[in-house]
Amino acid sequence: MGNRAFKAHNGHYLSAEHDHVKTHHGHHDHHTHFHIENHGSKVALRTHCGKYVSIGDHKQVYLSHHLHGDHSLFHLEHHHGKVSIKGHHHHYISVDGHGHVSTSHHHDHHATFEEHIL
């Protein structure tokens, strides 16, 4: 499916740095590029350094060195020109008002991103 960048409601892009997913870049660069891999009806988000965005059993967002089954697979839900990233246990990747990346069981503007095709 190619590379994507995801811009949060706060104007910052999801960014993969070291073992963390953050949002402190107001512009996109290689840290904010995610390769979308098809896995049947779901997708995986692979970072520039080959790690996978994942959601753990305690609903934390982390980067994994390997594809961790359902923990690393997502549905991209498109609506009204935006996208939501729905993952493990039906939780959405979310960005709070301070830019902290976590998950939310609720689908609201914190869990909605502008999708930029690169």
From Swiss-Prot:
Stretches for region 2 X 13 AA approximate repeats: 34-86
Protein name: Hisactophilin-2
Annotated keywords: Actin-binding, Cell membrane, Cytoplasm, Disulfide bond, Lipoprotein, Membrane, Myristate, Phosphoprotein, Repeat
Protein modification: Phosphorylated.
Keyword Lipoprotein: yes
Protein's membrane topology: Lipid-anchor
Function, as annotated: May act as an intracellular pH sensor that links chemotactic signals to responses in the microfilament system of the cells by nucleating actin polymerization or stabilizing the filaments.
Annotated region (Contains several HHXH repeats), positions in chain: 8-109
Source superkingdom: Eukaryota
GO terms of biological process kind: actin filament polymerization; hyperosmotic response; response to acidic pH
GO cellular component, one term: actin cytoskeleton
Main location: cytoplasm
Lipidation (N-myristoyl glycine): G2
Similarity comment: family membership: Belongs to the hisactophilin family.
Residue numbers spanned by region Disordered: 99-118
Keyword Cytoplasm attributed: yes
Compartment list: Cytoplasm; Cell membrane
Xref: InterPro entries: Actin-crosslinking, Fascin-like_dom, Hisactophilin
GO molecular function, one term: fatty acid binding
Start and stop residues of the Sequence repeats: 34-46, 74-86
Subunit structure: Homodimer or heterodimer of hatA and hatB, linked by a disulfide bond.
